Amino acid sequence: GLPQGLADASTSLDRSRRAPAAGAAESERALHKVLVLDPAAGTGTFLSAVIRLIHARVAAGGDSGAWSDYVSNHLLPRVFGFELLMAPYAVAHMKLGLQLIDTGHDFRSPDRIRVLLTNALEGPHELAELPPFSGWPAEDADAAGERDRAPSIMVVLGNPPYSIFGQTPPGPWIRGLLDDYKTGLNERKLNLDDAFIKFIRLGQWHIERRGAGVLAFVVSNTFLDGITHRRMRES
């Protein structure tokens, strides 16, 4: 079990073994077992709550003097957010940075808040060089050779947008993932184009890549009993 929950700082070894054609041999690295992601972070409200909870857990352990080292080595490397718009992205960085300073963290040069200015629904390709996301594109990891992933728990949380109105059409990557929710459906109108459904599918993909996880979104409840959402529920 993980008695510290989101504050768990344990790591496990991740091994990658690529085929000779890929030009690389076996490699290994330590990955944290508990990873946290808000794929529509906005101004960082949910990530702020995560930091507040983790700080309380660490402080309850009676070693508050180690907090700054914990942030550098075990919080910032495994808590992530994605945000598409510049204004909330900037606010999130300021909010989370000030919050960590208020808790007593002393920012060092390598430290960075990992809220990324990116469209989470465009796929993992932009994140390929950023641990723990490196190697996530399936066509790289799966086709090139075998990969024994370190067991970890992916916590995907937040309050993604609900509606399709005013949005640009989804890209091919997320459209391909949504096909799993449409398999065998014969209805004329599927009602599977809302943004929150795309984010649920995205969260499912992240968890499947890691082997276990928790999906905690504030979303519309229409998928709970919608006729055309039955494949989504099964999945």
Residue spans for each PLM region:
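SAM-dependent methyltransferase catalytic region
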Residues: G1-E234
